[in-house]
């Protein structure tokens, strides 16, 4: 049995959870999330907690036990608090700006790169170099932040590019001069 899966998930105030078999719907102040969990687990609501249990002792069922518990916990936290990822743009002339729901990134290419925010995701830019991706779905926030970082990943020589806030870039020494 999974150590993570064993612990019940508390449901905070202002959050409602509805279960329909393996379909879980969570509504809260920040929005609503729906997800269908894979087979091999059962989800029950006991008082103000959600309990996830494996249906059998098969390996696949035990593997999915902790995963499903974490997915439901992330949904509950997402609709109550929300998630955000911060990115930093490093380099001369590199900047970002928001136009409506579109993030426009100038990262040293011959053209600016435009990214449309999917439903449930918002982009915010501070000082033209700090981008914040926020939303209720943890997976979607992480994927969008990774797509932005992939526009110009940080390079190891000067550290230019788009990196996560707090990310350490392993620096390399440049060419050594002629001897």
Swiss-Prot record:
GO MF assignments: rRNA binding; structural constituent of ribosome
GO biological process terms on file: cytoplasmic translation
One of the record's GO cellular component terms: cytosolic large ribosomal subunit
Transmembrane segments: none
InterPro entries per UniProt: Ribosomal_uL6-like, Ribosomal_uL6-like_a/b-dom_sf, Ribosomal_uL6_a/b-dom, Ribosomal_uL6_bac-type, Ribosomal_uL6_CS
Keywords: Ribonucleoprotein, Ribosomal protein, RNA-binding, rRNA-binding
Xref: PANTHER family: 60S/50S RIBOSOMAL PROTEIN L6/L9 (PTHR11655), LARGE RIBOSOMAL SUBUNIT PROTEIN UL6M (PTHR11655:SF14)
Known partners and oligomeric status: Part of the 50S ribosomal subunit.
Family: Belongs to the universal ribosomal protein uL6 family.
Purpose: This protein binds to the 23S rRNA, and is important in its secondary structure. It is located near the subunit interface in the base of the L7/L12 stalk, and near the tRNA binding site of the peptidyltransferase center.
UniProt cross-references to NCBIfam families, sorted A to Z: L6_bact
Name listed for the protein in its UniProt record: Large ribosomal subunit protein uL6
Annotated source species: Synechococcus sp. (strain WH7803)
